[in-house]
């Protein structure tokens, strides 16, 4: 909720229910944010649910749609399909007419992502996502949170002209790549971090979310997936949930609890 406005800020009013894309420091009761990174929450969305929206939706929109340019009819491979990023990517890709291949680590998570619309679900502990992608003609876009360990396999999974966007390094910071394989697929690899983008880029991302994605949220076509909410004083418990990797969607700190 807006408590104060800086000089010259327009389009917002004290008392407005908003969500914001932060550069960090979100474990707080009050934050100061550039006005361009603050937007009204989608109609019908609770403040608690809205807390799960900015980081994940901005990450997916900026990388999958703005950078990689996913088109209707193309195939998206998203790793970690049951994560906050993954559940958002699946829903948005399907809403805009794309096919989705995703990886998960358990049968329970596989069931959830299928319900969200994933077309092909791969349990990475048992099956090969490269083969799964090849069976559907290859991935046009890969959204990768793993990094080094998956680099070569992501290239192998590409369709001709495919685009890989690396946004995480859970599988290491280094990977070996046969450039011939990338050349043969006429593929591209990008690596981005939302946190370190300049304020004007973040403002543009948030503006596009309001224009293109908020109507989908308000219509119930896509929604933030909340695994659990905890009060701020239980932040250590929230991190333990994430470390155990048993969650589906986002874990949110509830400052009103």
Q: What are the residue ranges of the model-derived segments?
A:
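C-terminal capping/lid region of NAD(P)-dependent oxidoreductase domains
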Residues: 214, 219-228, 236-257
């Amino acid at each position: 909720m807006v408590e104060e406005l800086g000089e010259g800020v327009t389009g917002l009013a004290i008392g407005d229910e908003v969500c914001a894309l932060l550069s960090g420091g979100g474990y707080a009761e009050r934050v100061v944010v550039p006005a361009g990174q603050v937007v009204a929450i989608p109609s019908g969305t609770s403040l608690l649910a809205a807390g799960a929206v900015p980081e994940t939706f901005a990450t997916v929109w900026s990388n999958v749609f703005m950078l990689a340019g996913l088109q209707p009819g193309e195939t998206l491979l998203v790793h970690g399909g049951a994560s906050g990023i993954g559940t958002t990517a699946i829903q948005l890709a399907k809403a805009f007419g794309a096919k989705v291949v995703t990886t998960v680590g358990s049968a329970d998570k596989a069931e959830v992502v299928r319900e969200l619309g994933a077309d092909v679900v791969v349990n990475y502990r048992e099956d090969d996502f490269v083969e799964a992608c090849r069976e559907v003609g290859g991935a046009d876009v890969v959204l990768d949170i793993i990094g080094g360990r998956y680099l070569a396999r992501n290239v192998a999974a590409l369709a001709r002209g495919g685009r890989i966007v690396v946004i995480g390094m859970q599988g290491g910071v280094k990977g070996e790549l046969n450039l011939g394989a990338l050349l043969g697929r006429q593929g591209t690899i990008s690596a981005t971090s939302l946190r370190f983008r300049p304020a004007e880029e973040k403002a543009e991302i948030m503006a596009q979310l309001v224009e293109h994605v908020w109507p989908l949220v308000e219509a119930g076509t896509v929604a933030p997936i909340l695994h659990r909410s905890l009060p701020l004083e239980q932040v250590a418990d929230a991190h333990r949930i994430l470390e155990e990797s048993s969650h589906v969607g986002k874990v949110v700190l509830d400052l009103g609890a």
